[in-house]
Each structure stands twice: as structure tokens, then as C-alpha cells.
């Protein structure tokens, strides 16, 4: 309703994905960070059953949108950051896996298209609640001022920040993993509920966040 503004910075924790084409008429998924190993018969659509859902969601969407012939392959993924750490691990992995398929099939997707498709896969195809900035942050990287406008329009403005400012910022921050994880979906659902019901305190808080992004820029 009101649009959004975000000043986003990425860090040097990464998601990794490799795809190896095989000839055994199987699809093998290895996700080492979540201890998942699955083998499926070759198919153009894989059932979303709670196992390796992010990889399956990307694969199903690529097959459907681009009408590609199914090929047997082995895909291996790993994430530096723990799942549920609040660092956008799921969205980053979707972008990473999607980029791997884009490279494999030589698909014409730039950073904007990649981000938008990753968002649609995660939020619409898989039904995972969340925001929109994580996919764009993972695809673009660096420091970005993002504008979320009407009609799903997103504008990413890369920021040129002096090295000494980045060094000072890094020296002033500590990232610590408590060992506990949480689902961001429940938090996002609560925020959406509050704003859709016209909760004035929640809406005012969102406006203050937007203003903070303007001020930081």
C-alpha cells in the first residue's frame, strides 16, 4: 500500500551450488548444510513434500517456464550461514540454485529477473512467507538502496561507499550465532496482519523504518 525503502548491506557468508549432468535417469539432491540426501527418478516436476523444497521449487519452475527437456543431474548445495539464523539463508539459496540452472541452460536472466523469479518461487510457488529484499540482496550484493513501488516494481540503487567507512562499520559490529533458530515466516505474517488491519502503531513503525533508510542514504 505504502511502498517500501531499504538500505541493505550484504556480508561475506555465501550459498554454494554445483550441478553435474549425469546419464543415469536420476535426479540426486545433496544439501550438506541441512543433511539432506535424496534420489528421485527423472521427471519434469518433483513433488514438494518438505524435503529439499527450495531446490525442487527452482527446478519445477525452470522446467515449467522454459519448456526444457528433463536431464538427469546431481545438484549439491551448501550454505555458510545456519538455517533460521535471520540472515536470509533460504532466499540466498533459492537465488544461488536458480543462478546455477540459469548457467547450465544458458537462460537469459539478469539480476533483476533472477531476483523477481526467486521471489516468486519462494513466496508464491512454495508458499513461504517473507519479504522481498533478501532475493535482491543476494543477487546484487554489496550496499544497495532499494525502492519497492506499486505494481511490484523494484529499483536497486547501488551505493558507492568509501573503503574507510566500510572498515569502520566492520570494526564496530559483531555477528554472533546464539545456536538458536527461528522462522521468519511467523514474524512476517504478524506484520502483514497488523498492517492489513490498519494497526496504527504497526504502520507508524513501518514508516519510521522507511525514514531511517532515507536518512542513512
Regions found by a protein language model. Give the residues of each.
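DPxDG-like acidic metal-binding loop motif
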Residues: 13, 87-107
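Generic hydrophobic-segment detector
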Residues: 74-78, 96, 108, 121, ...
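C-terminal nucleotide
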Residues: 1, 6-67, 116-129, 135-217
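Flexible, acidic active-site loops/lids enriched in D/E/S/T/G that coordinate Mg2+ and/or position polar
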Residues: 59, 70-79
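Phosphate-handling active-site elements
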Residues: 64-74, 101-117, 151
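Short pre-catalytic strand/loop immediately N-terminal to key active-site residues, enriched for Gly-Thr
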Residues: 81-85
Amino acid at each position: 500500500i505504502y511502498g517500501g525503502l531499504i538500505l541493505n548491506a550484504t556480508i561475506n557468508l555465501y550459498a554454494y551450488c554445483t550441478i553435474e549432468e549425469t546419464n543415469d535417469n536420476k535426479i540426486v539432491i545433496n544439501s550438506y548444510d541441512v543433511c539432506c540426501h535424496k534420489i528421485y527418478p527423472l521427471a519434469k516436476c518433483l513433488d514438494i513434500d518438505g524435503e529439499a523444497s527450495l531446490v525442487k521449487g527452482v527446478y519445477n519452475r525452470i522446467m515449467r517456464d522454459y519448456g526444457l527437456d528433463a536431464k538427469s543431474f546431481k545438484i549439491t548445495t551448501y550454505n555458510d550461514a545456519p538455517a533460521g539464523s535471520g540472515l536470509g539463508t533460504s532466499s540466498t539459496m533459492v537465488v544461488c540454485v536458480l543462478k546455477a540452472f540459469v548457467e547450465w541452460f544458458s537462460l537469459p536472466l539478469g539480476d533483476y529477473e533472477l531476483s523477481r523469479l526467486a521471489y516468486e518461487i519462494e513466496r508464491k510457488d512454495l508458499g513461504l512467507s517473507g519479504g522481498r529484499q533478501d532475493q535482491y540482496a543476494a543477487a546484487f550484493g554489496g550496499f544497495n538502496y532499494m525502492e519497492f513501488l506499486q505494481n511490484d516494481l523494484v529499483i536497486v540503487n547501488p551505493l558507492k561507499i568509501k573503503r574507510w567507512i566500510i572498515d569502520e562499520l566492520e570494526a564496530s559490529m559483531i555477528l554472533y550465532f546464539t545456536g538458536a533458530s527461528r522462522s521468519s515466516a511467523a514474524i512476517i505474517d504478524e506484520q502483514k496482519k497488523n498492517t492489513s488491519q490498519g494497526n496504527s502503531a504497526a504502520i507508524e513503525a513501518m514508516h519510521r523504518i522507511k525514514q531511517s533508510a532515507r536518512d542513512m542514504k
